[in-house]
Structures are given as C-alpha cells and as structure tokens.
Amino acid sequence: ELKGFMTTNAPGILGQGIKMAQAIGADTVDMDQIQIHPTVQYDSASLITEGLRGDGAILVNTEGKRFIDEVSTRDVVSAAEIAQPGSYSWLIIDQKMVDESSVIQGYIKKGYTFEGKTCEELAEQIGVDGAALAETINTWNGYVEAKNDPDFGRTSFTQALDTAPYYAIKVTAGVHHTMGGLKIDTNTEVLNENGEIIPGLFAAGEVTGGVHGANRLGGTAVSDFVVFGRIAGKAASDYAA
C-alpha cells in the first residue's frame, strides 16, 4: 500500500535494528501503524514544517481550491490530500510570512517555491486557474477577518494572505514516523514472543513500538527517545557492571 510514497526519513533507516533483534527472538508491536505527514516537498522529500499552516498558510488543489482544514491532524489532512487530483497540493504563503520566517526564506533559497506578484501570476506559475486561486485567497482572507471558516471549520486564523508577492510550495503526503517496532517493558528491556525479557537487549526511540499507539502526536518522539534513551542507557550500564 505504500508503494510510491516518499519518506522524510534518512536513506539509511531501513529497519536493521528491528531485524537484528528479531533474529534473536524479539517480538514486535504495532507494525501496521505509520504516520503520514501531509507537507513533504514534492521533488526532494524534504519535510515542510506544519508551522507554516499554523502561521496562516493554506492548501489548495490543482483547481486552486481549498479542500480541508489545514491545521487538522496529520492523518486527516494527508488523507484529504491523497484524495485530490494527482495526490498533491500547493501550500500558499505571502510575503508577510516570508519576512517573518527564516525557515521559509531557507525554502526559497533551496528552490522549493514558485512566486507570483499577484494571485493570478502565481496561479500561472503552478498551472492552476488564476481566477479560482484569487477567489480562494480572497475568501480565506474574509474568513480570517471574521474568525470563521464555514467551509471546513478551521479555527486557526493567525493572519490573512494579503501581502504580495505570493508563493507556493508543491507538497504531498509522505511517511514520517513508524509507530511500530520492538516490544519493550518500562525498563526498555526487549521482550520475546512469550513476553519474556531477552537478557542484555535494550531499545529506545523509533526502533520500539507500543509507545505512541496508532498516531504519534507532533513533537512527542523527542520526549520518547530522551526519556527512554536515558532509561535504556542506565539499564544497559547496570547490566554490564
């Protein structure tokens, strides 16, 4: 089912740790649970921070229309994006956002953005209908002013997209995190298929499963590997002593 999906993870992350542990009897959990991130740059597989949507960006499809509450959960936004023509969308931002964000400025330097002095000019750059895109942006700006999105129920209205030039980044959904992995106990000891500890084998971080359930919350992987990493390090040290 994942054939053709890109991933934000490093090329060297291929599940080797899980395979090595399985070779000596380790059990796994939640191996069917993955997290898809909706804003992965279409050509490079680079993660485009969701902070842009929180700061006011919108997503439009190939018709130049919004199709989802952009700040909904990653799985919901990704599913809506995958259902669009071509399974991709355009992340729309304006100059005001660019001026306020070194991150966006970095995206521009990397060549991820298309630019237009007007909504219609940007639409021409990205191959969507100019009138439709202009109407979408104008409508969205009205929603921001009214603090109400009757189309999709978005409740985040940080700022309007009203400062030219306008920019677009082509994004698609990509595998961002795998919730499944080695089954461990609270001391980070890896368990076998009978639920028994495998002596001397400890694991922490994304190689493990059962920590995040079916869908990881943004940012919690950091607390996962920091907390369980420290526990695993101390436990391994105590075991070796």
Regions found by a protein language model. Name each.
Residues Q22-V29, K65, E124-A131, E135-A146, ...:
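Generic secondary-structure signature for well-ordered alpha-helical cores
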Residues T8-P11, L47-G51, I82, V171-V175, ...:
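Short Gly/Pro-enriched turn/cap motifs at secondary-structure boundaries
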Residues R66-S89, N192, I198-E206, G210-V222:
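Gly/Pro-rich active-site capping loops and adjacent beta-alpha segments
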Residues A132-N215:
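A glycine-rich dinucleotide-binding beta-alpha-beta segment and adjacent secondary-structure elements
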Residues I18-A132:
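An anion/pyrophosphate-binding glycine-rich loop and adjacent beta-alpha core
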Residues E1-M20, I169, T208-A240:
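A conserved FAD-binding loop/helix module that cradles the flavin
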Residues G12-K19, G54, S87, T113-E121, ...:
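Conserved active-site and cofactor/substrate-binding residues in soluble primary-metabolism enzymes
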Residues T62-E63, T186, E193, V227:
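Short, ordered coil/turn segments that flank beta-strands lining enzyme active or ligand-binding pockets
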